[in-house]
Amino acid sequence: MALTKAELAENLFDKLGFSKRDAKETVEVFFEEIRKALESGEQVKLSGFGNFDLRDKNERPGRNPKTGEDIPITARRVVTFRPGQKLKARVENLKKEQ
C-alpha cells in the first residue's frame, strides 16, 4: 500500500480542518515547489525528513536484454533522495517493533 497525494489531502482535511479544496491545493503547491526547485538545479532539504538531490550519471555501456546487443546508455540527470537521521531512526524503530 502506498500513501497518495489524495490521502495526504484527506489527512490535512481531517487533522487540520482545511476545506477539501484547500487541502488538495496545499498538497499540489507543496509538490510543485519541490519540482520547481529541482528543475532549477537546487537541492531540496526537508529538515527532519531528508534531502532531494540531482545527480549526473555518465554514459555507460549496456545490453539489450532481448537481443544481447551492446548499446550505450546515455548520460542523464536523476533525482535522488537521502533520508535524514530522524527519518532513518523512526523507520529503524518500526522494524524492531514489528
From Swiss-Prot:
Belongs to the bacterial histone-like protein family. HAMAP family: IHF_alpha (MF_00380). The gene is ihfA. This is Integration host factor subunit alpha. Heterodimer of an alpha and a beta chain. Disulfide bonds: none annotated. This protein is one of the two subunits of integration host factor, a specific DNA-binding protein that functions in genetic recombination as well as in transcriptional and translational control. One of its GO terms (cellular component) is cytosol. The keyword Transcription applies. Keywords: DNA recombination, DNA-binding, Transcription, Transcription regulation, Translation regulation. One of its GO terms (biological process) is regulation of translation. GO terms for molecular function: DNA binding; structural constituent of chromatin. Residues 53-69 have a biased composition (Basic and acidic residues). PROSITE patterns: HISTONE_LIKE. Residues 51-71 are annotated as: Disordered. CDD domains: IHF_A.
